[in-house]
Amino acid sequence: MKKFALATIFALATTSAFAGFNGNNSQGGFQQAAPAAISVKQALSAADNSMITLVGNITQQIDDDEFWFTDGTGQIKIEIKKRVWNGLNVDSKDKVKIYGKLDNEVFEKAELDVLRIEKAE
């Protein structure tokens, strides 16, 4: 009798463990709006580590992941890692929107580390 009671208690106790968790299924997180696009001229004088959005054209490839970018107000060197491209193909005629972190050291020219790139509308 004790064995039967013990087995029953064990069976009832473990059924809730096998039920699974069905909690919050929403994909959460804070969605901040991207910063408004500024000109290259403004970006060249912005503070180091600023998050910048630019709209313009990639005019020339310098290295594997370095390019010249212009919007008509100035020119800035940008760095786009291969993973950031995400299958996007552009040429110098395509207008693109880039989001990145400005690297503006005191004794060096400003450079933008691109975190996201997309074709501009």
UniProtKB/Swiss-Prot annotation:
Signal peptide coordinates: 1-19
Coiled-coil segments: none
Keyword Signal assigned: yes
Record's keyword terms, sorted: Periplasm, Signal
GO cellular component: periplasmic space
Cell compartment(s), UniProt: Periplasm
Name of a matching Pfam family: BOF
Family: To E.coli YgiW.
Name by which UniProt lists this protein: Uncharacterized protein HI_1709
Source organism per UniProt: Haemophilus influenzae (strain ATCC 51907 / DSM 11121 / KW20 / Rd)
UniProt lineage: Bacteria, Pseudomonadati, Pseudomonadota, Gammaproteobacteria, Pasteurellales
